[in-house]
Structure formats: structure tokens, C-alpha cells
């Protein structure tokens, strides 16, 4: 991680679809999905570039068609950061829905009790420009891997 370029992650709206107490799981991929698989990975760091171990990275999103599961926990779950502040969770690139570009909601629960609520966006989406919540510093860095795509996103929180 290049500490010289760190900026605090943007605080963005939770939206109406958050559900408390999701399951802990490192893959949100459903067996019959037709979506593009992506591993979202990165670090939780303080503004002075120190890793945050044991942070809970809570993720929820629409499926590949742009629909949220409001009755169960499909495309909802969390992972914990390791001793180096690293997290990794497998999912699919979510679909758009009216007024919103592709995005993944995230709450980062710090051991101190502080919470960062934000959203992660994907590059190259024409709908980014028309989404009123879209924030450029929450744009994932995408790369291709042997099994699909990787979205690199570091979460930088106040000390």
C-alpha cells in the first residue's frame, strides 16, 4: 500500500436495504449465478497507514440483475480483517437498478466501535456519471485473474 496517497474513505449513505446480523462467509456467490465473479480485496487502514486487525467488513449488494434479497441473506455477509488489516470476499458484479450504477455497500466495523459506512463503485460504467451517490475515491481498481476479476479497494478510516 502506498501510504503517501492515502485519503480517508468517503462516508456514503447506507441506503434502504441494510440488514443487521448477516452471516460470516468469504463468498457471497450463489450457485446458479450468471453474474461476473469478482474478488473484492484490500486493506482496512488508519489515516496514518496503520493496519486495522479484526475489523468486520460487512457487505451487501444487489444481484447481477439489480435486485436485493430483502427476505434472506443472498449477497450479504461479512469477513474479518487479518493481523495485517487485509480482507477478501468473493461476489459478483451487481446489476444496475433505476437511478443507481453498479455498487457494493460496505460497513467497516472497527474494534474501537467506530463504523465507516460507504459504497464501492466499478470503473468504466457509463451510469457512474448520473448516479448522485457515486464518489470517485471509492472506485475499485480492477484487474483480471485466472478465475475472474479482482476489485482492489482499501478502506481508510479516521485514527
Walk through the language-model features, giving the residues of each:
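Beta-strand-dominated extracellular/periplasmic modules and repeats
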Residues: 1-159
